Amino acid sequence: TSLPAQEAFDIEYWLLEEAKLRRMPAEKELARQVVIVAGAGSGIGRETAIRLSREGAHIVAVDVSEEAAKATAAEITSRAGSGIGIAGSGLSACGPAVGLSADITDRASIRAMLDGAAIAYGGFDSICVTAGVFAPSDKSGHIPDARWASTFAVNVTGSYLVADEAAATWRDQGLKGSLVLTTSANAVVSKRGSLAYDTSKAAANHLVRELAVELAPLIRVNGVAPATVVQGSSMFPRERVIGSLAKYGLPYAESEETAVLVARLAQYYAERTLTKSPITPADQAEAYFLLVGGRLSKTTGQILAVDGGLPEAFLR
C-alpha cells in the first residue's frame, strides 16, 4: 500500500525544518532577555545598554532626560533594525530597544516606566541601575543639606525604589532575573572633597547585600564598583575636570580642548592603579554583562570592582 499523504508530508516537512534549524546560528547569550538600564542616556549606562544589546538583549533605555534615553535606544535600533511597534501605545519601533524617561527618586515615575517596559515587551528580566550624581563640597568645604539629601536620593534611595517597585513584577512573573546596582571604589576609600558621594556609595554597597537577601531566590542582586571614570562620563563636565586638575597640582590652560584635559586627568587617575590604564565606561559594561547573564548565575550579594587595581580599595 502507498504511504498516506499526511505521513509523507510529515516526513519530508519536518526533516527539512530540522535541517534549517541546524543551519541557523546559535542564539546570542542574552537573546529573549529584556533588560532595563537606568541612566542609559550617557556614560556607563549608555555603554552598558549598547553592550547588552550586542549580546541579544532587548533594551529599555531609561534616563531622567527622555531625549537622551531615546538617543541611546535609537543608536541600538540603527544597528539592529526596528521592530513592528505596538499600535496605540506610543512605543513604536520597540524591536531591539525603546527609550523611556524616569526620575528614579520618584516612585510614581518609576512605576510608569516599568509599566511602559511591560507594554513594550510584556515584562522584564533584569535591571541595571547606573544613574548617579556627584555633589562636591562648596568652596568652604561644607556640603549644604540639600546637596547631601539629593546625593542620597539618587545614589541610594533611587536604587531602593527601583528594586522595590520591580519586586512586585518579578514576583508575578515568577522568573529568575538580576538586579545590578552601581556603587564605587570610593565606598571603601575615605578622602577629602567627596563626603556625600563616598558615604552614599558605602550605603549602596550594603544596599546590594540587603536586597540580595530580600529578593532571593528569584532575583540575584550584585553591584559594580568602578574607580573614577572620567572619559565619557556626564559626572565630569569641563568645570569639574579643571577643578580636579587644579586640586592635584596638574598643569592646564583654559585654552586647552576639553578632550585634552579629560585625557590628562584620566591618566592621572590611571597612574594610581596597578594596571596603569584609564578606566572607561566600556570596562564597566563588561561587568554588567557578566552579572546580568548566566555566567555568574550563583553569584549574589557581591560587589565586583572594576577599578584597575586600587590597593587602598582592597578588601580588608
Question: Where do the protein language model's features map onto the residues?
Answer:
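Active-site helix of classical SDR
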Residues: 163, 200, 208
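Active-site loop immediately N-terminal to the catalytic Tyr-X3-Lys motif
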Residues: 141, 189-195, 276
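Short C-terminal tail/terminal secondary-structure segment
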Residues: 137, 288-289, 300-316
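Conserved glycine-rich cofactor-binding loop
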Residues: 41-42
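Short, small/polar-rich loop/turn modules that mediate ligand/substrate recognition or access, typified
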Residues: 216-220, 299-301
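Residue(s) in the substrate-gating loop at a strand-loop-helix junction
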Residues: 184
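Substrate-binding pocket helix/loop in short-chain dehydrogenase/reductase
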Residues: 138-140, 144-149, 269
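Catalytic Tyr-X3-Lys loop
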Residues: 124, 144-160, 180, 197, ...
